[in-house]
Amino acid sequence: NKIPINVYISNPSNKNKSGFIEIYQKWFNEFKNKEIKLLEIGIDKGDSLRIWRDFFPNAKICGLDIVKKDFSINGVELFTGDQSDCNFLKTVVEKYKSFDIIIDDGSHLSKHIIASFSYLYPHLNNNGLYVVEDLQTSYIPRYGGSRIRLNKNSTSMNFFKKLADCVNYEHYDKPFFKENKFD
């Protein structure tokens, strides 16, 4: 039930270099032989899409990237568009309706991560997984982050920290959050 070692050694995907494969193996294993729908944002050369296709033999897999790709991958549908453009995301959702796994390995810009999460999360199936890679970009200025202002409201890291507060609002002494679309 492991992601085949030959698949990720022969594919120079950064997921192997970053140690993501071992983590994904743990969390994705329950989906392995199911008929799932997987969306990956940010596909570069398609290496990770090939990994998902081989690991999830019964899955419908799609990938999106802002740059049009000059390759195709058997069993994978490719979309070209901006991950922060809700109209573009709507075309993907209209075709697939919902997803079991969504992986955001796109631009790593906080505003893009927040926009795509806000649009796509409501289309994640119950018990589905939404993964955002490389959240450390919240601390890197060129991605809209800050190494100094750790509470900068516009970073993806702080968006998710606040979301954790929002989902648990009823446990505060004096609740100051109201229910939200992520409940």
In which residue ranges do the predicted regions lie?
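A short alpha-helical cap/connector motif
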Residues: 1-103, 107-132, 136-183
